[in-house]
């Protein structure tokens, strides 16, 4: 099982839109092994394209063994992140078949790859504002908690903490939400903000949107906090060397 398989409890083409979006988000950051028409020459690669009813598609897997297993033998390949491959295929006017015969099998046509490219183009806009913080909406927590936890887990070691809060004064529900990030070095903040903006672009839109804030102030008690601690393996209890000696 791979990271893509873990998200495919329901097959991609049977899943609802949020589940498909989460798989595509993970696909963008997955190192894919894509079949080539011939061995690469320097940095030039020629993707092996297969004719299908809807047009030509490239074939990629998330492990070398899966690609070799599909062909029944070793085949020329190149490794590249899904986001890079999606860009190449958009230029070539081709689709993408991922992990055929596996739990995470997906067939992405040109329209799906175009949507993926649009989501990956999401970028934060820097700004400042004075906000009144409040508890996040239950609906927003239900929609964002799990996928945000997965993405924030990728940032362990780069940030010290994260919390989701609501913002706004009027009404029973927050007008918007803020994802508070603590402990991020200033030089890393643009890259972290871009990664989180991409993640949010793949998730169901929330009323008023979700902003990303870098602050060292402790989140309020009503915030939804994300546990970024690294789990330590519990050492096994020492085994006795032998039965006790009875005297």
Regions found by a protein language model. Give the residues of each.
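An interfacial alpha-helical scaffold signature
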Residues: 1-247
């Amino acid at each position: 099982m791979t990271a893509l398989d873990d998200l495919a409890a329901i097959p991609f083409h049977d899943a609802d839109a949020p589940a498909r979006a989460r798989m595509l988000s993970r696909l963008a950051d997955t190192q894919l092994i894509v079949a080539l028409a011939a061995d690469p020459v320097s940095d030039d690669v020629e993707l092996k394209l297969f004719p299908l009813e809807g047009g030509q598609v490239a074939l990629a897997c998330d492990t070398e063994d899966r690609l070799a297993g599909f062909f029944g033998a070793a085949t020329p390949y190149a490794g590249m992140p899904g986001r890079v491959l999606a860009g190449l295929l958009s230029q070539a006017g081709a689709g993408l078949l991922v992990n055929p015969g596996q739990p995470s099998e997906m067939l992405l046509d040109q329209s799906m790859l175009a949507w993926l490219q649009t989501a990956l183009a999401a970028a934060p806009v820097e700004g400042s504002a004075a906000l009144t913080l409040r508890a996040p909406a239950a609906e927003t927590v239900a929609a964002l908690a799990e996928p945000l936890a997965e993405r924030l887990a990728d940032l362990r070691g780069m940030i010290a903490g994260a919390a989701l809060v609501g913002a706004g004064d009027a009404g029973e529900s927050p007008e918007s939400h803020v994802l508070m990030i603590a402990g991020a070095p200033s030089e890393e903040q643009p890259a972290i903000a871009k990664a989180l903006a991409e993640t949010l672009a793949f998730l169901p839109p929330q009323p008023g949107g979700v902003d990303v804030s870098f602050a060292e102030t402790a989140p309020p008690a009503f915030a939804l906090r994300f546990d970024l601690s690294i789990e330590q393996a519990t050492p096994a209890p020492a085994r006795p060397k032998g039965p006790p000696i009875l005297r």
